[in-house]
């Protein structure tokens, strides 16, 4: 009986690890993909200042420009589970069962999906809102 309880607890803890929020390993440079999954000239850099996520962006070979500094309406925060479920519903059906963690603000969300059997295999998504519509675009990590 004790072993069964330990196994249930272990399974619950292992499952929650896969659904954990973004962490330092998600920091990096990403190129935004278009709707056909081709790289665009838009790049984004996400990193943490202390516990706060911040974001820089650039077009092509231009210099990085600060975009979200962790204050005001651009402050990136851990996304609520209900919002994450809504965004996942926009993705292909075969991806919707994968755990996803996000940070968001008033304009966009940055999200990571991980395979439960291989958490190092990750997919990144950028969700943006415009005129009442949500757009889901892939991100390729470049650094």
Where on the chain are the PLM-derived regions?
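Sec-dependent signal peptide recognition
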Residues: 2-10
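Sec/Tat signal peptide C-region and signal peptidase I cleavage site
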Residues: 15-21
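Short, solvent-exposed loop/hinge segments that bridge or flank secondary-structure elements
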Residues: 22-59, 94-106
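Sequence contexts marking disulfide-bonded cysteines in secreted/extracellular proteins
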Residues: 30, 67-75, 101-103, 110-112
């Amino acid at each position: 009986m004790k072993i069964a309880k330990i196994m249930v607890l272990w399974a619950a803890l292992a499952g929650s690890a896969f659904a954990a929020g973004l962490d330092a390993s998600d920091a990096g440079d990403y190129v935004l993909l278009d709707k056909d999954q081709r790289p665009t000239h838009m790049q984004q850099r996400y990193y943490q200042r202390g516990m706060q996520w911040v974001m820089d962006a650039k077009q092509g070979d231009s210099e990085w420009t600060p975009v979200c500094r962790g204050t005001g309406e651009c402050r990136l925060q851990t996304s609520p589970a209900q919002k994450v479920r809504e965004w996942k519903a926009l993705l292909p059906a075969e991806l919707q069962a994968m755990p996803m963690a996000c940070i968001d603000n008033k304009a966009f969300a940055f999200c990571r999906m991980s395979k439960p059997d291989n958490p190092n295999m990750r997919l990144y998504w950028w969700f943006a809102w415009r005129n009442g519509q949500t757009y889901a675009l892939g991100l390729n990590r470049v650094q």
